[in-house]
Amino acid sequence: MRMFDVQGVEIVASRQKVFEFLRVPGNLTRWAHAFVSAGNGRARLETPAGAIDIALEVDADAEAGTVDWRLTFPDGGVGLAQSRVTETTRDTCIYSFVLHAPPVALEQVEGALDAQSALLRSELATLKSLMEP
């Protein structure tokens, strides 16, 4: 059973520009579809299944180019996502994203991860369009 998915996108923008955008929690609302608000250690997610307020920790390291998120749900469940922005020799950067299976019952993991993986592809395309000239 798959417990994670890794996706990436090449973006015609500097590593610094993309990293600086990603490290700001409030920008999640511009590219991560479920986020309707984010900031000050909190976020609100809305999906077809409903809305929920969560704790949101962001760990960003400019030198490494990493931006990692820890989402803590009211029931104590924890969701993780790790990402990295790397530069290329083509005046572009590559943004890679590790999506972990959500904190749901094991029998729901595969379907939930498949759905989130499809959504992530769309979100990465949105991010790319926001960052490119």
Each model region followed by its residue ranges:
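Conserved short-loop catalytic and cofactor-binding motifs
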Residues: 6, 42, 108-111
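Beta-strand/loop substructures that line and gate deep hydrophobic ligand-binding cavities in soluble
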Residues: 73-122, 126-133
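An N-terminal domain-start capping segment
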Residues: 1-2, 49-51, 125
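Glycine-rich portal/gate segments that line the openings of hydrophobic small-molecule binding cavities
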Residues: 27-80, 88, 94, 130-133
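Short beta-strand-to-loop capping motifs
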Residues: 11-13, 47, 71, 101
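Generic structural detector for well-ordered beta-strands
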Residues: 8-12, 57, 84
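Hydrophobic ligand-binding cavity/cleft-lining segments
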Residues: 1-38
